[in-house]
Amino acid sequence: MATKRRPLRPNLGGTAGSPSSSGSNMNFRPGGPDITRSEARGTRPTAAPTSIREILVMGVIHLCKKTIFFNTDLKVALYLGSLFVISVIGDFVPFPKTYFARSDNLFNQYFVKIGWGWTLLFVVPFLVLSAYTITCGDHKRMLRHHFPRIVIATFFWFFWTKLFNVVENSYGRCTTKGYATKSSCLKAGHLWKGFDISGHAFILIHSSLVLIEEARPIIRWETIKEHIRNERHNRSTAENSGTNPLRTLNEEQMRSLQFLYKRLTPIIRTLFIGMAALQLLWDIMLVGTMLYYHRMIEKVISGIIAILTWYFTYRFWYPTPGLLPEAPGNGSFSYQREIPTFPFKRPSHLSTGAATTSSGSNSSRTNLNGKAATTGVPRDQQIPTFMGMPLFTSPKAASAAANLLMSDQQKRERDREQQTLES
Protein backbone atom coordinates (compact mmCIF):
# COMPACT_ATOMS: atom_id res chain seq x y z
CA MET A 1 0.00 0.00 0.00
CA ALA A 2 1.38 3.39 -0.99
CA THR A 3 2.23 5.74 1.82
CA LYS A 4 1.85 9.50 1.88
CA ARG A 5 4.72 11.29 0.13
CA ARG A 6 6.96 13.47 2.20
CA PRO A 7 6.81 17.13 1.19
CA LEU A 8 9.68 18.41 -0.90
CA ARG A 9 9.96 21.44 1.36
CA PRO A 10 8.85 20.92 4.98
CA ASN A 11 7.54 23.82 7.00
CA LEU A 12 10.67 25.54 8.23
CA GLY A 13 8.63 27.74 10.53
CA GLY A 14 7.53 24.84 12.77
CA THR A 15 8.22 24.64 16.46
CA ALA A 16 11.49 23.42 17.81
CA GLY A 17 11.48 19.70 18.29
CA SER A 18 8.79 19.07 15.67
CA PRO A 19 9.71 16.72 12.84
CA SER A 20 9.54 19.54 10.31
CA SER A 21 12.15 21.56 12.20
CA SER A 22 14.57 18.74 12.75
CA GLY A 23 17.60 18.71 10.45
CA SER A 24 17.73 14.91 10.58
CA ASN A 25 14.30 14.65 8.97
CA MET A 26 15.18 16.88 6.01
CA ASN A 27 15.76 15.16 2.68
CA PHE A 28 17.32 18.28 1.12
CA ARG A 29 19.94 20.91 1.92
CA PRO A 30 18.56 23.81 3.98
CA GLY A 31 17.94 26.85 1.86
CA GLY A 32 16.73 25.08 -1.23
CA PRO A 33 16.50 26.46 -4.73
CA ASP A 34 14.49 29.52 -3.71
CA ILE A 35 17.29 31.06 -1.68
CA THR A 36 17.74 34.68 -2.66
CA ARG A 37 20.90 35.94 -4.35
CA SER A 38 21.71 38.23 -1.43
CA GLU A 39 21.73 35.19 0.89
CA ALA A 40 24.11 33.19 -1.28
CA ARG A 41 27.74 32.95 -0.26
CA GLY A 42 30.84 31.54 -1.87
CA THR A 43 29.84 31.94 -5.52
CA ARG A 44 30.13 34.97 -7.76
CA PRO A 45 26.85 36.57 -8.86
CA THR A 46 25.90 36.09 -12.47
CA ALA A 47 24.84 38.82 -14.85
CA ALA A 48 21.17 39.67 -15.17
CA PRO A 49 19.37 38.45 -18.31
CA THR A 50 19.94 40.70 -21.31
CA SER A 51 16.87 42.14 -23.00
CA ILE A 52 16.33 42.23 -26.76
CA ARG A 53 16.57 46.02 -26.67
CA GLU A 54 19.93 45.82 -24.91
CA ILE A 55 21.23 43.36 -27.49
CA LEU A 56 20.20 45.66 -30.36
CA VAL A 57 21.80 48.68 -28.69
CA MET A 58 25.03 46.78 -28.11
CA GLY A 59 25.01 45.70 -31.75
CA VAL A 60 24.79 49.32 -32.88
CA ILE A 61 27.52 50.30 -30.40
CA HIS A 62 29.74 47.53 -31.78
CA LEU A 63 29.31 48.78 -35.35
CA CYS A 64 30.06 52.35 -34.25
CA LYS A 65 33.23 51.18 -32.50
CA LYS A 66 34.36 49.40 -35.65
CA THR A 67 33.84 52.62 -37.60
CA ILE A 68 35.32 55.23 -35.31
CA PHE A 69 38.14 53.16 -33.81
CA PHE A 70 39.62 52.15 -37.12
CA ASN A 71 43.43 52.08 -36.70
CA THR A 72 44.20 55.74 -36.00
CA ASP A 73 47.78 55.63 -37.25
CA LEU A 74 46.62 54.09 -40.51
CA LYS A 75 43.81 56.64 -40.79
CA VAL A 76 46.29 59.50 -40.37
CA ALA A 77 48.44 58.02 -43.13
CA LEU A 78 45.35 57.71 -45.34
CA TYR A 79 44.47 61.34 -44.68
CA LEU A 80 47.88 62.56 -45.82
CA GLY A 81 48.13 60.16 -48.74
CA SER A 82 44.63 60.96 -49.99
CA LEU A 83 45.16 64.71 -49.65
CA PHE A 84 48.23 64.44 -51.84
CA VAL A 85 47.15 61.87 -54.44
CA ILE A 86 43.53 62.92 -54.97
CA SER A 87 44.44 66.61 -54.94
CA VAL A 88 47.21 66.13 -57.52
CA ILE A 89 44.82 64.26 -59.79
CA GLY A 90 42.19 66.96 -59.32
CA ASP A 91 44.67 69.72 -60.20
CA PHE A 92 45.45 68.17 -63.58
CA VAL A 93 42.29 66.19 -64.39
CA PRO A 94 39.15 68.00 -63.22
CA PHE A 95 36.59 65.71 -61.65
CA PRO A 96 32.98 65.70 -62.89
CA LYS A 97 30.88 68.28 -61.09
CA THR A 98 28.38 66.88 -58.62
CA TYR A 99 26.14 68.29 -55.92
CA PHE A 100 29.08 68.31 -53.50
CA ALA A 101 31.04 70.58 -55.86
CA ARG A 102 28.64 73.43 -55.11
CA SER A 103 29.76 75.61 -52.22
CA ASP A 104 26.11 76.16 -51.23
CA ASN A 105 25.27 72.47 -50.85
CA LEU A 106 23.35 71.48 -47.75
CA PHE A 107 26.21 69.69 -45.99
CA ASN A 108 28.69 72.48 -46.62
CA GLN A 109 26.32 75.22 -45.48
CA TYR A 110 24.92 73.62 -42.34
CA PHE A 111 27.67 71.22 -41.26
CA VAL A 112 31.17 72.00 -42.52
CA LYS A 113 31.06 75.78 -42.07
CA ILE A 114 30.05 75.31 -38.44
CA GLY A 115 31.82 71.96 -38.13
CA TRP A 116 33.58 72.74 -34.87
CA GLY A 117 30.25 73.69 -33.31
CA TRP A 118 28.77 70.31 -34.28
CA THR A 119 31.84 68.58 -32.86
CA LEU A 120 31.52 70.39 -29.53
CA LEU A 121 27.80 69.62 -29.44
CA PHE A 122 28.58 65.91 -29.05
CA VAL A 123 32.05 65.91 -27.50
CA VAL A 124 31.40 68.26 -24.56
CA PRO A 125 28.47 66.35 -22.98
CA PHE A 126 30.12 63.00 -23.71
CA LEU A 127 33.35 64.11 -22.04
CA VAL A 128 31.58 65.62 -19.03
CA LEU A 129 29.32 62.62 -18.39
CA SER A 130 31.92 59.90 -18.99
CA ALA A 131 34.63 61.69 -16.99
CA TYR A 132 32.18 62.44 -14.17
CA THR A 133 31.32 58.74 -14.01
CA ILE A 134 34.86 57.32 -14.01
CA THR A 135 35.94 59.90 -11.41
CA CYS A 136 33.11 58.62 -9.17
CA GLY A 137 31.32 61.97 -9.09
CA ASP A 138 34.40 64.08 -8.36
CA HIS A 139 33.45 67.18 -10.37
CA LYS A 140 36.61 69.05 -9.37
CA ARG A 141 38.81 66.34 -10.85
CA MET A 142 36.64 66.19 -13.94
CA LEU A 143 36.92 69.95 -14.50
CA ARG A 144 40.64 70.04 -13.79
CA HIS A 145 41.87 66.80 -15.36
CA HIS A 146 39.55 66.31 -18.35
CA PHE A 147 37.57 69.37 -19.40
CA PRO A 148 40.69 71.42 -20.33
CA ARG A 149 41.20 69.09 -23.31
CA ILE A 150 38.19 70.68 -25.00
CA VAL A 151 39.49 74.17 -24.21
CA ILE A 152 42.89 73.28 -25.71
CA ALA A 153 41.33 71.76 -28.84
CA THR A 154 39.16 74.86 -29.30
CA PHE A 155 42.18 77.11 -28.84
CA PHE A 156 44.11 75.32 -31.60
CA TRP A 157 41.07 75.43 -33.90
CA PHE A 158 40.74 79.20 -33.39
CA PHE A 159 44.50 79.87 -33.61
CA TRP A 160 45.14 77.97 -36.83
CA THR A 161 42.03 79.17 -38.70
CA LYS A 162 42.84 82.79 -37.85
CA LEU A 163 46.45 82.27 -38.90
CA PHE A 164 45.30 80.87 -42.24
CA ASN A 165 43.27 84.05 -42.83
CA VAL A 166 46.25 86.23 -41.91
CA VAL A 167 48.47 84.38 -44.38
CA GLU A 168 45.91 84.73 -47.16
CA ASN A 169 45.39 88.45 -46.52
CA SER A 170 49.10 89.21 -46.17
CA TYR A 171 50.35 87.30 -49.21
CA GLY A 172 47.45 87.81 -51.62
CA ARG A 173 46.34 90.49 -54.03
CA CYS A 174 43.17 91.60 -55.72
CA THR A 175 42.63 90.91 -59.42
CA THR A 176 41.85 94.62 -59.81
CA LYS A 177 44.28 97.24 -58.61
CA GLY A 178 43.24 99.69 -55.93
CA TYR A 179 42.10 97.22 -53.28
CA ALA A 180 44.58 96.46 -50.52
CA THR A 181 42.49 94.13 -48.38
CA LYS A 182 40.59 90.98 -49.14
CA SER A 183 37.34 92.27 -47.68
CA SER A 184 37.31 95.42 -49.80
CA CYS A 185 38.24 93.44 -52.91
CA LEU A 186 35.46 90.91 -52.44
CA LYS A 187 32.96 93.60 -51.49
CA ALA A 188 33.60 95.33 -54.80
CA GLY A 189 32.87 92.11 -56.67
CA HIS A 190 36.44 91.22 -57.59
CA LEU A 191 38.55 88.12 -56.87
CA TRP A 192 41.29 87.86 -54.28
CA LYS A 193 44.19 85.61 -55.22
CA GLY A 194 46.37 84.42 -52.38
CA PHE A 195 47.82 81.39 -50.62
CA ASP A 196 44.59 80.07 -49.12
CA ILE A 197 45.51 77.25 -46.73
CA SER A 198 42.46 75.00 -46.63
CA GLY A 199 40.53 75.75 -43.47
CA HIS A 200 37.93 73.15 -44.47
CA ALA A 201 40.48 70.34 -44.64
CA PHE A 202 41.98 71.42 -41.30
CA ILE A 203 38.62 71.60 -39.52
CA LEU A 204 37.46 68.23 -40.87
CA ILE A 205 40.66 66.37 -39.95
CA HIS A 206 41.04 68.15 -36.61
CA SER A 207 37.41 67.45 -35.69
CA SER A 208 37.65 63.79 -36.75
CA LEU A 209 40.76 63.14 -34.67
CA VAL A 210 39.30 64.90 -31.62
CA LEU A 211 36.11 62.83 -31.96
CA ILE A 212 38.12 59.61 -32.18
CA GLU A 213 40.29 60.37 -29.15
CA GLU A 214 37.53 61.73 -26.93
CA ALA A 215 35.34 58.70 -27.67
CA ARG A 216 37.90 56.27 -26.24
CA PRO A 217 36.30 56.08 -22.76
CA ILE A 218 33.54 53.95 -24.34
CA ILE A 219 36.08 51.15 -24.90
CA ARG A 220 35.32 48.36 -22.38
CA TRP A 221 32.69 50.62 -20.79
CA GLU A 222 30.38 47.63 -20.34
CA THR A 223 32.93 45.94 -18.07
CA ILE A 224 32.34 48.58 -15.38
CA LYS A 225 28.97 46.97 -14.64
CA GLU A 226 30.65 43.60 -14.16
CA HIS A 227 33.35 45.12 -11.96
CA ILE A 228 30.71 46.75 -9.76
CA ARG A 229 28.79 43.48 -9.38
CA ASN A 230 31.91 41.47 -8.52
CA GLU A 231 33.28 44.06 -6.13
CA ARG A 232 29.97 44.23 -4.28
CA HIS A 233 30.08 40.46 -3.94
CA ASN A 234 33.69 40.52 -2.73
CA ARG A 235 32.91 43.09 -0.07
CA SER A 236 29.78 41.28 1.12
CA THR A 237 31.74 38.03 1.55
CA ALA A 238 34.94 39.68 2.84
CA GLU A 239 36.90 38.34 -0.12
CA ASN A 240 40.02 40.09 -1.37
CA SER A 241 40.36 40.38 -5.13
CA GLY A 242 43.73 41.33 -6.53
CA THR A 243 42.40 41.98 -10.03
CA ASN A 244 39.20 44.01 -9.64
CA PRO A 245 40.05 47.65 -10.51
CA LEU A 246 37.41 48.90 -8.05
CA ARG A 247 39.05 47.33 -5.01
CA THR A 248 40.75 50.62 -4.05
CA LEU A 249 37.52 52.65 -4.01
CA ASN A 250 35.90 53.51 -0.72
CA GLU A 251 32.23 52.88 -0.04
CA GLU A 252 31.13 56.40 -0.97
CA GLN A 253 32.93 56.19 -4.31
CA MET A 254 31.36 52.80 -4.97
CA ARG A 255 27.87 54.16 -4.36
CA SER A 256 28.50 57.17 -6.60
CA LEU A 257 29.93 55.01 -9.37
CA GLN A 258 27.04 52.55 -9.22
CA PHE A 259 24.45 55.35 -9.33
CA LEU A 260 26.14 57.38 -12.08
CA TYR A 261 26.87 54.37 -14.27
CA LYS A 262 23.25 53.24 -14.17
CA ARG A 263 21.80 56.71 -14.80
CA LEU A 264 24.28 58.09 -17.36
CA THR A 265 25.19 55.05 -19.47
CA PRO A 266 22.14 55.34 -21.81
CA ILE A 267 22.97 59.01 -22.47
CA ILE A 268 26.66 58.25 -22.99
CA ARG A 269 25.83 55.51 -25.49
CA THR A 270 23.49 57.82 -27.43
CA LEU A 271 26.15 60.53 -27.60
CA PHE A 272 28.73 58.00 -28.75
CA ILE A 273 26.50 56.88 -31.62
CA GLY A 274 26.12 60.53 -32.63
CA MET A 275 29.90 61.03 -32.45
CA ALA A 276 30.52 58.01 -34.68
CA ALA A 277 27.97 59.22 -37.24
CA LEU A 278 29.44 62.73 -37.21
CA GLN A 279 32.98 61.43 -37.66
CA LEU A 280 31.84 59.39 -40.65
CA LEU A 281 30.20 62.51 -42.12
CA TRP A 282 33.44 64.48 -41.68
CA ASP A 283 35.35 61.81 -43.61
CA ILE A 284 32.82 61.97 -46.46
CA MET A 285 32.99 65.77 -46.59
CA LEU A 286 36.79 65.61 -46.54
CA VAL A 287 36.67 63.59 -49.76
CA GLY A 288 34.54 66.34 -51.30
CA THR A 289 37.11 68.93 -50.23
CA MET A 290 39.89 66.86 -51.79
CA LEU A 291 38.00 66.64 -55.07
CA TYR A 292 36.69 70.15 -55.60
CA TYR A 293 38.28 72.79 -53.36
CA HIS A 294 41.73 74.41 -53.01
CA ARG A 295 45.03 73.40 -54.51
CA MET A 296 47.04 70.37 -53.49
CA ILE A 297 49.70 72.24 -51.50
CA GLU A 298 47.06 74.20 -49.58
CA LYS A 299 45.24 71.04 -48.53
CA VAL A 300 48.38 69.07 -47.67
CA ILE A 301 49.72 71.85 -45.44
CA SER A 302 46.42 72.14 -43.56
CA GLY A 303 46.31 68.36 -43.13
CA ILE A 304 49.87 68.27 -41.78
CA ILE A 305 49.06 71.03 -39.28
CA ALA A 306 45.93 69.19 -38.06
CA ILE A 307 47.83 65.91 -37.65
CA LEU A 308 50.77 67.54 -35.85
CA THR A 309 48.34 69.25 -33.48
CA TRP A 310 46.66 65.91 -32.74
CA TYR A 311 49.99 64.15 -32.22
CA PHE A 312 51.33 66.84 -29.88
CA THR A 313 48.25 66.83 -27.68
CA TYR A 314 46.85 63.29 -27.64
CA ARG A 315 50.02 61.30 -28.21
CA PHE A 316 52.61 63.38 -26.34
CA TRP A 317 51.06 65.90 -23.94
CA TYR A 318 48.08 64.12 -22.37
CA PRO A 319 49.67 60.65 -21.87
CA THR A 320 52.70 62.18 -20.11
CA PRO A 321 52.49 61.39 -16.36
CA GLY A 322 52.33 64.43 -14.12
CA LEU A 323 50.97 66.78 -16.79
CA LEU A 324 47.42 68.05 -16.94
CA PRO A 325 45.00 67.40 -18.49
CA GLU A 326 44.96 63.61 -18.41
CA ALA A 327 44.31 61.32 -21.34
CA PRO A 328 40.70 60.28 -22.08
CA GLY A 329 39.59 57.29 -20.01
CA ASN A 330 41.74 58.04 -16.95
CA GLY A 331 39.81 58.18 -13.70
CA SER A 332 39.63 56.90 -10.15
CA PHE A 333 40.12 53.35 -11.45
CA SER A 334 41.47 51.69 -14.57
CA TYR A 335 38.79 49.72 -16.39
CA GLN A 336 40.34 49.52 -19.87
CA ARG A 337 43.17 47.18 -18.93
CA GLU A 338 42.86 43.53 -19.90
CA ILE A 339 42.53 41.44 -16.72
CA PRO A 340 43.86 37.87 -17.07
CA THR A 341 41.32 35.28 -16.10
CA PHE A 342 44.06 32.96 -14.82
CA PRO A 343 46.97 35.15 -13.71
CA PHE A 344 49.66 32.51 -13.40
CA LYS A 345 51.27 29.96 -15.66
CA ARG A 346 51.34 26.29 -15.08
CA PRO A 347 54.74 25.28 -13.66
CA SER A 348 56.89 23.39 -16.11
CA HIS A 349 57.17 20.40 -13.76
CA LEU A 350 53.41 19.86 -13.96
CA SER A 351 53.81 18.27 -17.37
CA THR A 352 53.01 14.59 -17.41
CA GLY A 353 54.68 11.82 -19.31
CA ALA A 354 52.32 12.39 -22.21
CA ALA A 355 53.49 15.98 -22.45
CA THR A 356 57.12 14.95 -22.95
CA THR A 357 56.17 12.85 -25.94
CA SER A 358 54.56 15.72 -27.81
CA SER A 359 56.58 17.11 -30.68
CA GLY A 360 57.21 20.82 -31.25
CA SER A 361 56.20 23.72 -29.07
CA ASN A 362 52.52 23.59 -30.03
CA SER A 363 50.34 21.02 -28.31
CA SER A 364 47.26 19.43 -29.80
CA ARG A 365 43.85 18.82 -28.39
CA THR A 366 40.90 16.97 -29.82
CA ASN A 367 37.89 19.04 -30.76
CA LEU A 368 34.28 17.92 -30.97
CA ASN A 369 34.79 16.62 -34.50
CA GLY A 370 37.60 14.36 -33.37
CA LYS A 371 40.26 16.42 -35.11
CA ALA A 372 43.42 17.69 -33.52
CA ALA A 373 43.25 21.40 -32.69
CA THR A 374 46.45 23.34 -32.10
CA THR A 375 46.34 25.49 -28.97
CA GLY A 376 49.45 27.55 -29.73
CA VAL A 377 50.63 27.20 -26.09
CA PRO A 378 53.50 24.90 -25.07
CA ARG A 379 52.26 21.79 -23.28
CA ASP A 380 54.34 22.52 -20.20
CA GLN A 381 52.66 25.92 -19.80
CA GLN A 382 49.06 24.81 -20.25
CA ILE A 383 46.73 25.04 -17.29
CA PRO A 384 45.11 21.75 -16.25
CA THR A 385 41.41 21.89 -17.05
CA PHE A 386 38.33 19.73 -16.62
CA MET A 387 35.47 20.29 -19.06
CA GLY A 388 37.05 23.57 -20.10
CA MET A 389 37.39 24.99 -16.57
CA PRO A 390 40.72 25.41 -14.72
CA LEU A 391 41.32 22.86 -11.99
CA PHE A 392 43.01 25.37 -9.70
CA THR A 393 41.60 28.63 -8.43
CA SER A 394 44.72 30.02 -6.77
CA PRO A 395 48.51 29.87 -7.22
CA LYS A 396 48.79 28.12 -3.85
CA ALA A 397 46.57 25.26 -4.97
CA ALA A 398 48.46 24.94 -8.24
CA SER A 399 51.81 24.83 -6.45
CA ALA A 400 50.57 22.19 -4.01
CA ALA A 401 49.32 20.03 -6.87
CA ALA A 402 52.59 20.53 -8.72
CA ASN A 403 54.63 19.42 -5.72
CA LEU A 404 52.39 16.38 -5.25
CA LEU A 405 52.74 15.35 -8.89
CA MET A 406 56.47 15.91 -8.84
CA SER A 407 56.98 13.80 -5.71
CA ASP A 408 54.77 11.06 -7.15
CA GLN A 409 56.71 11.10 -10.41
CA GLN A 410 60.04 10.93 -8.56
CA LYS A 411 58.76 7.98 -6.53
CA ARG A 412 57.78 6.08 -9.68
CA GLU A 413 61.19 6.77 -11.21
CA ARG A 414 62.94 5.44 -8.09
CA ASP A 415 60.76 2.31 -8.18
CA ARG A 416 61.65 1.72 -11.84
CA GLU A 417 65.36 2.16 -11.10
CA GLN A 418 65.10 -0.25 -8.17
CA GLN A 419 63.37 -2.85 -10.35
CA THR A 420 66.06 -2.44 -13.00
CA LEU A 421 68.85 -3.02 -10.46
CA GLU A 422 67.15 -6.10 -9.01
CA SER A 423 66.68 -7.63 -12.44
Swiss-Prot record:
The regions listed as transmembrane in this protein's record are 76-96, 114-134, 147-167, 192-212, 271-291, 300-320
Write out the annotated subcellular location. Answer: Endoplasmic reticulum membrane
**What biological function has been recorded for the protein in this entry?**
Fatty acyl-coenzyme A (CoA) diphosphatase that hydrolyzes fatty acyl-CoA to yield acyl-4'-phosphopantetheine and adenosine 3',5'-bisphosphate. Preferentially hydrolyzes unsaturated long-chain acyl-CoA substrates in the endoplasmic reticulum (ER) lumen. This catalytic activity is required for maintaining ER structure and for lipid droplets (LDs) biogenesis, which are lipid storage organelles involved in maintaining lipid and energy homeostasis. May directly bind to diacylglycerol (DAGs) and triacylglycerol, which is also important for LD biogenesis.
Q: Phenotype upon knockout?
A: RNAi-mediated knockdown results in loss of auditory sensitivity. In the whole body or specifically in muscle cells or fat body, results in locomotor impairment, uncontrolled and uncoordinated wing movements leading to flightless phenotype. In nociceptive dorsal class IV dendritic arborization C (ddaC) neurons results in altered branching and dendritic field coverage in third instar larvae. In fat body reduces lipid droplet size with aging. In all neurons does not show any of the phenotypes above.
What does the UniProt keyword field contain? Endoplasmic reticulum, Hydrolase, Lipid metabolism, Membrane, Transmembrane, Transmembrane helix
Topology of the protein relative to the lipid bilayer: Multi-pass membrane protein
Compositionally skewed regions (Basic and acidic residues) per UniProt? 409-423
> Where is it found, in Gene Ontology cellular component terms?
endoplasmic reticulum membrane
- Which parts of the chain does the record assign to the membrane side Cytoplasmic? 1-75, 135-146, 213-270, 321-423
Identify which residues the record assigns to the active site: H200, H294
InterPro entries per the UniProt record, alphabetical: FIT, FITM1/2
Can you say what this protein is called? Acyl-coenzyme A diphosphatase FITM2
The ranges of region (Disordered) come to 1-47, 344-381, 400-423
On whether Cell wall biogenesis/degradation is a keyword of this UniProt record, the answer is no
Q: Where is the composition biased (Low complexity)?
A: 351-367
Source organism: Drosophila melanogaster
Q: Which family does it belong to?
A: Belongs to the FIT family. FIT2 subfamily.
